[in-house]
């Protein structure tokens, strides 16, 4: 299994996970000013926002937080469609930012946004270079 590297400012130390996790999640998410946490009935269920790429395009993103932080969040395009032939997406239409076995409960929603930004920039390169995914790849 390959471990995911992450900037420490996108991780949650134990005291932040145990105390008021959503307070710290909001603080870390401020690094991505267009993103907000959404909820119903007092529970946080998703995050939404938009990311700009190196080519000047903006992509809407919805992050579903089912069973968060114990399971990898699902990242979906919002207001656009992933080209169907791209390899790095799941069958449910969500974006593959990492494998579920790489997810750790100290990862934050902000880390998911950062990994999504990397995916989007690679996606734009993929669209321009004859559909070859740039960089290293992993099996799903």
Feature locations, PLM:
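UBC/E2-like fold recognition across ubiquitin and ubiquitin-like conjugation systems
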Residues: 1-60, 69-140
């Amino acid at each position: 299994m390959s471990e995911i590297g992450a900037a420490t400012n996108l991780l949650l130390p134990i005291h932040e996970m145990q105390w008021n996790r959503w307070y710290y999640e909001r603080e870390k998410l401020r690094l991505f000013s267009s993103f907000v946490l959404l909820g119903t009935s007092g529970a946080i269920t998703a995050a939404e926002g938009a990311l700009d790429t190196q080519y000047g395009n903006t992509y809407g993103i919805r992050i579903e937080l089912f069973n968060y932080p114990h399971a990898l969040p699902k990242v979906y395009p919002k207001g656009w469609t992933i080209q169907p032939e791209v390899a790095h997406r799941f069958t449910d239409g969500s974006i593959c930012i990492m494998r579920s076995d790489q997810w750790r409960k100290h990862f934050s929603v902000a880390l998911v946004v950062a990994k999504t930004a990397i995916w989007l920039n690679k996606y734009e390169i993929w669209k321009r270079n004859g559909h070859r995914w740039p960089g290293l790849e992993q099996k799903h």
